[in-house]
Design a protein with these regions (language model features):
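Short, acidic/polar
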Residues: 24-37, 114-128, 184-192
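Active-site mouth loops of central-metabolism enzymes
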Residues: 16-28, 103-119, 150-154
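Beta/alpha (TIM)-barrel catalytic core signal, keyed to glycine-rich beta->alpha loops juxtaposed to Asp/Glu
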Residues: 29, 139-337
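Active-site gating/metal-coordination segments in enzymes
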Residues: 87-135
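Conserved, mostly hydrophobic/aromatic
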Residues: 13, 30, 45, 60, ...
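Short amphipathic alpha-helices and their capping/turn segments at secondary-structure boundaries
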Residues: 1-5, 57-73, 118-133, 217-230
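Short, well-ordered coil/turn segments that N-cap beta-strands
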Residues: 7-11, 41-43, 68-72, 131-135, ...
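N-terminal binding-site loop/beta-alpha segment at the start of enzyme catalytic domains
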Residues: 1-92
Length: 337
């Protein structure tokens, strides 16, 4: 099923912050954030067992428990099982994401992309989310940022396990769509080139943004559009760097990134627009993009995101970005064509 048809609106909600990403978020604040998203009209919520070792899914399930199930769409991820046993979270080996979720639940997380583990993961997520169905399942993080030189072996495990399981679940009507949920372009390229598999789309985080988009633009977006698939873009603010935060790719931003942000902001200020408007509207200008899912850990962020989509961004802003070499000249922008 096309993600463009399945997803209810262009703005969704990424729940990673609700897993206590970077900080310990009080329950009341987490609930207020989900309520703000719902009251704003957002009806697509992306989750993952990895986010706080199930914490984000639990919070989302509690917040949506009294909402009509046919009114919203849920995606979650497979590839990580959350066990009942606990562990020292500081001892976890989580690749580039390091201690991002050190304030989450202490339950042990194991990487497992096998067929049986995929079925178990879906069942576990259904329980945490307090729902009877999940519309979209993403295979999570089969990429270099987590597995280094072993990523191809993990991808092969997913090819023979998770991909087959999700194909079956979709054919049986348990889910409506599946694909990869990754922070790198290469796994998507690889899956698109495989025969015999029929993904419905992809969740690509941090790789189609104002700050980093060239490889995705050249290698993924055209194929996705040609096949009638869709991309959900996560991390449109590049871990917060685009909107003045200190991090890029879950780590302190480099001087080069900070300089690029400053140059973009100079142009945005000149035209009287917010950096959020620039970031979100750039992403959604690509016809392959079905939705964008900024993460939010505070209620006020929801209103900011919605307002950013409504801002009028002058065409001269995009032209000046291109002329300054701050975006790829081939990247679609609002008003093209």
């Amino acid at each position: 099923m096309s993600l463009h048809d399945l997803l209810p609106g262009k703005l969704g909600f990424g729940t990673a912050p609700l897993g206590n990403m970077f900080r310990d978020i009080p329950e009341a604040e987490a609930r207020a954030t989900v309520d703000a998203a719902w009251n704003d009209g957002i009806r697509y919520f992306d989750n993952a067992p990895f986010y706080g070792a199930g914490l984000a899914e639990i919070r989302m399930g509690d917040a949506l428990a009294d909402k009509p199930r046919d009114a919203y769409v849920i995606s979650t991820k497979v590839g990580r099982l959350v066990l009942d046993e606990v562990e020292d979270v500081s001892a976890r080996d989580l690749g580039e994401k390091g201690e991002v979720f050190k304030y989450g639940r202490p339950n042990r997380i194991v990487n497992d992309y096998s067929y049986d583990a995929t079925l178990r993961s879906i069942d576990d997520s259904l329980a945490r989310l307090k729902t009877d169905r999940i519309e979209i399942a993403w295979v999570h993080d089969v990429a270099q940022d987590f597995y280094g030189d072993e990523w191809l072996a993990m991808f092969e495990s997913a090819r023979t396990g998770a991909f087959r399981a999700l194909d079956r679940l979709r054919d049986e009507g348990v889910i409506k769509a599946w694909g990869l949920g990754v922070n790198r372009v290469e796994p998507i390229e690889l899956l698109l080139d495989l025969e015999g598999l029929r993904p419905d789309g992809f969740l690509l985080a941090g790789r189609y943004t104002l700050l980093d988009h060239s490889r995705a633009l050249q290698r993924v977006m055209p194929k996705v559009a040609e096949r009638g698939l869709g991309i959900v873009v996560g991390g449109p603010y590049s871990s917060g760097a685009l909107v003045g935060g200190p991090n890029f790719e879950y780590a302190p931003a480099t001087p080069a990134i900070l300089d690029k942000v400053a140059r973009i902001k100079t142009l945005a200020d000149r035209h009287g627009i917010s950096m959020k408007a620039a970031g979100l509207q750039f992403v959604l200008a690509n016809p392959a993009v079905a939705a964008v899912i900024p993460g939010a850990s505070r209620p006020e962020r929801i209103a900011e995101d919605r307002a950013a989509l409504r801002e009028t961004v002058p065409t001269d802003f995009w032209r000046e970005l291109r002329e300054a070499g701050l975006i790829d000249r081939q990247a679609p922008v609002p008003g093209d064509g």
